[in-house]
Amino acid sequence: MDLRIGGKYRISRKIGGGSFGEIYLGTNISTNEEVAIKLEPAKAIHPQLLFESKLYKIFQGGIGIPAVKWFGFDGDYNIMVMDLLGPSLEDLFNYCGRKFSLKTVLMLGDQMLRRIEFIHSNNFIHRDIKPDNFLMGIGKRGHVVNLIDFGLAKRYRDPKTHQHIPYREHKNLTGTARYASLNTHQGIEQSRRDDLESLGYVLMYFNRGSLPWQGLKAYTKRDKYEKICDKKAQTKIDTLCQGFPSEFATFLNYTRFLKFEDKPDFLYLRKLLREMFVREGYRYDYMFDWVIVRKLREKPPLERPLSNDNKQIQQQIQQQQQAQQQLQQQAQQQQQQTTTTTTTSSSQPSNVKNISTVSNIATTTTDEQFRQLLSTPSYNNVDSDQSPQQTTTTTSSSNPNQTTFYRQNKVVVPQSSSTTTKPPAK
């Protein structure tokens, strides 16, 4: 049967679903472009699709925000056609053995902060920040982190007067308990600070592999939420972040000290992450862990680990990153030597070129530009999303209620161009 939506899109197979409805892979009949088609029963008790489609239109044009191509009604369904995206960060986290390297955490955190700042600048809070709601792009935008699922989002201030919503208590928990802020657990109305506290927990989840309040047993959902809240309150931030750079504890402490109506200092938070990045000597080359793992798994049998043991894969990732750092240190030493040589040989004829200096420019320009970004102003709607990348698709989210927009397939992760070293613009 040839099912068509809006006279323009053809529905093919189901790629996801949950309590909200179902998601199908679709195709633009005219261009053959693949899209995601989300269907919600028109008689849903708590319909969200119309509201969500309006938010996507408000956020339209933002970096890392999928575009809505069509919204309408057909028979018993509300229907939204959107950009097709790649795997979620939760999918990729599982693919990499449920632990990310510090470099990957910092590159992701930088983009995730900018996505949250963008929706806050448009007067909304997300209220469900978690790995499942961040999806990588596909094709040439495979290195771009996308924020999705605005069904629980809420306007926190008037768009004209910027009057903040009032402080309230005794609210039900909205979002995902694992990543919810302490104030959310305690029934306090959410505001901008809560999105950022949730992001802090997500980053530590990526660092640690799990959070201390996971796996708690309870007979009812209410009891489980209470146990998670108690464990979260009892776990000191320094304990949660032990063994990792102190900036992660600083990040979480900052979010917890924010007041209800406070505007978060995103520049300060990004600077925390970026200073770590520079201190570790990383290059912003979009070489995420899943790119390295994919390359390792594609090696001939004699070159790759004897099994898919996650520890072996993590060791391989660390070895490759150490090798990259050593190469960078050598380049910096050569640059220093070149500077000395240039100073002592300034009396050379003008037609004599210092070949060493010329050859080192390409290896140092990117890092210098990246350091300059530490002092750049707060968010503007510009991103370095032109890095050529090749990506395909992956399995559906581990959360059955998660809105995901990608093909249900075997795990095939995005590739990245190893020659791309351009840092993200602010």
UniProtKB/Swiss-Prot annotation:
This protein's UniProt keywords: ATP-binding, Cytoplasm, Kinase, Nucleotide-binding, Nucleus, Phosphoprotein, Serine/threonine-protein kinase, Transferase
Pfam family, one: Pkinase
BP GO terms, sorted: DNA repair; endocytosis; signal transduction
Entry-linked Gene3D superfamilies: Transferase(Phosphotransferase) domain 1 (1.10.510.10)
EC number assigned by the record: 2.7.11.1
Catalytic activity: L-seryl-[protein] + ATP = O-phospho-L-seryl-[protein] + ADP + H(+); L-threonyl-[protein] + ATP = O-phospho-L-threonyl-[protein] + ADP + H(+)
Sequence ranges assigned to domain Protein kinase in this UniProt record: 9-278
Record note on what altering residue 38 to R does: Abolishes growth
Single annotated GO MF: protein serine kinase activity
Residues binding ATP: 15-23, 38
Broad class of the protein's primary localization: cytoplasm
Bias-annotated ranges (Low complexity): 386-404
Function summary: Casein kinases are operationally defined by their preferential utilization of acidic proteins such as caseins as substrates. Can phosphorylate a large number of proteins. May have a role in DNA repair mechanism and support vegetative growth of the cells.
Protein name: Casein kinase I
Organism: Dictyostelium discoideum
Name of the encoding gene: cak1-1
